[in-house]
């Protein structure tokens, strides 16, 4: 396929942003990171295609506004300001969503809560309409983790998440958003994940997310709406995980295998807009927010190398090349 791509520096983006509109702007596709400067590759020229949203089930949420005893604050146009608690201060996703929502201070009041100590247990959740849980451990080098470290993944990704959801429900929070992950499908053979794909985590990291995913869904009822988000690899300025590592490798490796795969990705501001939509519409259900277009890993690596001015030789994906890539620390090998 021929890519109609425009290299766009994230540090200078934003000229197209329409603060007062609720629609989701252009689908962003790919990432080329050059040290502190991240570049985004657009699929289309207009950058106005809608983000592909595929809910696992039809969200059947009531649009009725419920009155909270200690919250009667309204914005100038009569819309009641929602109070949102982000549990997991300092996270990349949490801070990005917080910054996005703060563009509309008349509609959202946002607090963050550090979950690394036990003080969160005494925090009053009853003052909030929405709790958005982003605390968790990610980016595991699954091949080099001790048994004790694995237990820590379950304590944080499973136990902490479920206990937070239970507290939110017990104290009258109307909606709980949980950041699960596409990693719950890591053991599936399907190349493209759909609403019919049954989760099958491949390792302890994916399983820790899947355990929480199921238990939190079970808490949902008419008074407690639960949104489970299973995003793919998230990218953007300052992102962590696979793609900054991949960008670094693309500027150093002399060769890279030609692989015929398709990977879904999600630009951080598209995720932030999606979270805003979930809150505004008081949704409930399981969702897979992702860019509409899938990307081929080899094509992405070539683009990154080109941006960096690095000569990268693409070679057929023979057995020895794939085995070599699999030995790369972290999760980069999975991308091939």
Question: Where do the PLM segments sit?
Answer:
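NAD(P)H-binding glycine-rich loop region in Rossmannoid oxidoreductase-like domains
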Residues: 121-163, 167, 184-187
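Conserved beta-loop-beta element that borders a ligand/cofactor-binding pocket
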Residues: 214-237
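Conserved Rossmann-fold NAD(P)-dependent oxidoreductase catalytic core, especially the SDR/UDP-sugar
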Residues: 162-204, 219, 227
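Short amphipathic, positively biased membrane-proximal segments
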Residues: 1-77
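Glycine-rich NAD(P)-binding loop of the Rossmann-fold in SDR/ketoreductase-type enzymes
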Residues: 152-160, 203, 207-208, 266
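Mid/C-terminal beta-alpha module of Rossmann-like enzyme folds, strongest
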Residues: 274-334
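N-terminal Rossmann NAD(P)H-binding glycine-rich loop of SDR-like oxidoreductase domains
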Residues: 84-101
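A conserved pocket-lining segment of Rossmann-fold NAD(P)-dependent short-chain dehydrogenase/reductase
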Residues: 245-266, 270, 277-278, 288-290
């Amino acid at each position: 396929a021929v890519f109609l791509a425009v290299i766009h520096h994230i540090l200078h983006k934003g000229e197209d942003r329409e603060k007062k509109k609720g629609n989701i702007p252009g689908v962003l596709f790919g990432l080329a990171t050059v040290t502190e400067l991240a570049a985004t590759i657009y699929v289309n020229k207009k950058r106005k295609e809608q983000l592909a949203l595929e809910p696992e089930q039809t969200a059947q949420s009531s649009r009725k506004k419920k009155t909270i005893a200690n919250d009667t604050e309204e914005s100038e146009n009569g819309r009641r300001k929602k109070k949102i608690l982000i549990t997991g201060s300092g996270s990349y996703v949490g801070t990005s969503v917080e910054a996005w929502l703060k563009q509309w201070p008349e509609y959202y009041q946002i607090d963050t809560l550090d979950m690394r100590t036990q003080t969160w247990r005494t925090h009053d959740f009853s003052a909030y309409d929405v709790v958005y849980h982003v605390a968790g451990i990610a980016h595991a080098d699954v091949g080099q983790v001790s048994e004790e470290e694995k237990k820590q993944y379950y304590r944080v990704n499973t136990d902490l998440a479920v206990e937070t959801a239970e507290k939110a429900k017990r104290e009258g929070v109307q909606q709980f958003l949980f950041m699960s992950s596409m990693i719950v499908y890591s053991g599936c053979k399907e190349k493209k994940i759909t609403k019919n794909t049954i989760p099958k985590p491949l390792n302890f990291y994916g399983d820790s997310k899947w355990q929480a995913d199921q238990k939190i869904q079970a808490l949902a009822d008419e008074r407690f709406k639960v949104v489970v988000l299973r995003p793919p690899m998230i990218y953007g300025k300052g992102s962590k995980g696979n793609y900054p590592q991949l960008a670094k490798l693309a500027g150093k490796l002399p060769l890279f295998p030609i692989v015929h795969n398709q990977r879904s990705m999600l630009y951080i501001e598209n995720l932030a807009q999606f979270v805003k939509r979930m809150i505004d519409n008081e949704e409930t259900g399981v969702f897979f927010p992702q860019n509409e277009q899938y990307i081929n890993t080899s094509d992405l690596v070539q683009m990154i190398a080109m941006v960096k001015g690095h000569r990268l030789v693409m070679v057929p994906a023979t057995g020895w090349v794939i085995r070599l890539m699999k030995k790369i620390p972290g999760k980069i090998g999975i991308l091939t």
